[in-house]
Amino acid sequence: EIHERLVGSEMCIRDRFTLVLGFISALLPTGFSPYIIPIPAYTILISIFTTPRNAFFASTIVLAIIAIGMHWNIEVVVSFMLLNTVVMTAVSKLKFSKRSDLLIVSSKISLAGLLIVGGIYFLEKYMMDIDNLLIFKDLGCIVVNCFVISGVLLLGILPIIENLFRIMTPYGLAELADHNQDLLKRLMQEAPGTFNHSLTVSHLCENAAEAIGANPVLARVGAMYHDIGKLLRPMFFVENQSFYGIENPHKACTPRFSKMLITAHPKDGIELAKDAHLPQVINNFILQHHGTSLVSYFYNEALKEEGAENVNEEQFRYPGPKPNMKETAILMLADAVESAVRAAKNPSNEEIDAIINK
């Protein structure tokens, strides 16, 4: 359901941007330079909200429709097609680490636009007489289009689009991954073992997401926050006990009480996330990363103490829900693997492979 809602939001955004681009094209005064139509900005926006590949195909279709409707010359169509290829290549290499990177990309696209449009006019000058004023006007329009509209203006309206559609862009996600964010800073200071675990898991999730075509930025950022619920009782989680210099406090607890403390951290994390106004898509990682898995250690301890006839396995499971997105499913696997490998004493590569396969 969550995945369908996200896909629906992305399609809604794409359709609305397409309508806006169509209106701009229709309202353009006769005789005005076609190079001012913000097709590069459209391609960048769709790339940010979906993928560069999807954006390239969507913008190519839109370009063809506009070109036919406005009776563009072939050189204008070729210019925009070449420019779209540059945009797709530039955005696909973007790491989305900070919003200002968009200005760097738009600068490169502006230079490419100048070279493409200028190169086509240079070739045409050998075949026909072209007014130099027209050339300079079109070159100016392509620079305004690629840098001012696709860079400066886009940078300003992205946060508005994020709030309006309640969907996270890679830039918004990258900002959440900043270790100076309050919850991450608290995790680093109050539960350093959990913070290091989250950092390791986030890298695993990012690599796995890239490998299967999921959203690597979302997977990495969601993994950074998945265990924030441990902030309420950090000493009850083994990775933090050496930092606090204490013995395992679970030795003084019954298996049922320990299970209650352990399985509470997703729910505790949601409360912290709501207080911090984290987006719902990040909350999904917090709530779903254990699914309905069994807390096997304390279940087995309860079997020893109480006997099998007095212990219900369902009472020792996380309440769920199970992951319902690729990225949260990746986190569930990565979290379990990292914890199991960390618990093993100096495992060999073969032993690590066996843990992963198990």
Put a short name on every predicted segment:
Residues 31, 63-90:
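Interfacial aromatic-anchored transmembrane helix boundaries in multi-pass membrane proteins
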Residues 63-71, 105-130:
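Hydrophobic transmembrane alpha-helices
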Residues 93-115, 135, 139, 143-144:
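Internal alpha-helical transmembrane segments of multi-pass membrane proteins
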Residues 39-55, 63-66, 86-91:
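Generic transmembrane alpha-helix motif of multi-pass integral membrane proteins
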Residues 113-116, 137-163:
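Alpha-helical membrane-embedded segments
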Residues 129-135, 139, 162-196:
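Membrane-proximal helical linkers
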Residues 182-346:
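Divalent metal-dependent catalytic cores for phosphoryl transfer on phosphate-bearing substrates
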Residues 1-8, 13:
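Single conserved hydrophobic/aromatic residue that forms the stacking wall/gate
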